[in-house]
Structures are given as C-alpha cells and as structure tokens.
Amino acid sequence: MNINKFTQKSLAAVQGCEKLAYEYGNQQMEQEHLLVSLLTLEDSLILKLIAKMEIQPEMFTGEAEKLLEKLPKVSGGGQLYVSNDLNKVLVNAEDEAKAMGDEYVSVEHLFLAMVKQPGRAIKELFRLYNITRERFLQALSTVRGNQRGVSDNPD
C-alpha cells in the first residue's frame, strides 16, 4: 500500500480510523472505523452517494456508529493495530483506483473495496440497506461523470 497515492480526504478517513479506535477504546482499527470515518468526513462524498442510493444518511450513519460500540474494548491504551479485514480494504482500494483509471486512491475507492470485501458486521449492514457495488457505482457516476483522480485533492 502506497500512502503517497492516497488523496487528502482518503488520508483523513484513515486517520479518522485511529481517532475513532482511541475514542471507543478499541485496540484494533477495523472496517467499522473506516466506514464511520468516511461517513463523518467534512463534506462527505460517501454520505452524498448514500443519499443518492435513496438511503437516509443519518439513519445509516447511526447504524454504522452502533457497530463501533459492539467492538471489543481495552483499557490502558497501548499499541493500536490494523485488522486484517481493514488492511485488505486499504490494499484493494489501490486496485479499485487502478481499475477506474485513477492515479490516486480516493474515498470512493475505499468504500468500493469495503463493498467488495466486507467484514461480517459491515456485510450485514450493507445487505440490510441493499448497498451493492452496482448501486454505488451508479450513484457515483451521477456525481463523478468521467472525471479521473489525477491529483491528491480531487475529492
């Protein structure tokens, strides 16, 4: 994974994972942290795309936040780790960017990678809200058109 190929917003989302893990007392950063981070970014593209899929953004974000509360908690701080599931998403996001002809990994690539390989709780949430790759790409095409991500600040 080449962090230099992440847009400023996607880097902010990854940094948000760490912040959320600390806030919720989790030892591992999980896909749930990334999802909530993507949804709560300032001027969140993912939140706009969720709305375009005719899903109530506030309700979906609330459900995602409930998933954070279910994660194992530790006390006393210590080292923070990236889970295997989250690592797969971060690595696969680069593949998503390349497949779309983009030079940089953006928030939509992170979300698509999560749709492709969701952890158990995320998979259930996506099923509940009927979030599929096809629906997400359709919503994305209405916003993005045929633009390509060729800078680290296109979001």
Feature map (PLM): residue ranges:
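Histone-fold recognition with a strong bias for associated Lys/Arg-rich disordered tails
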Residues: 1-155
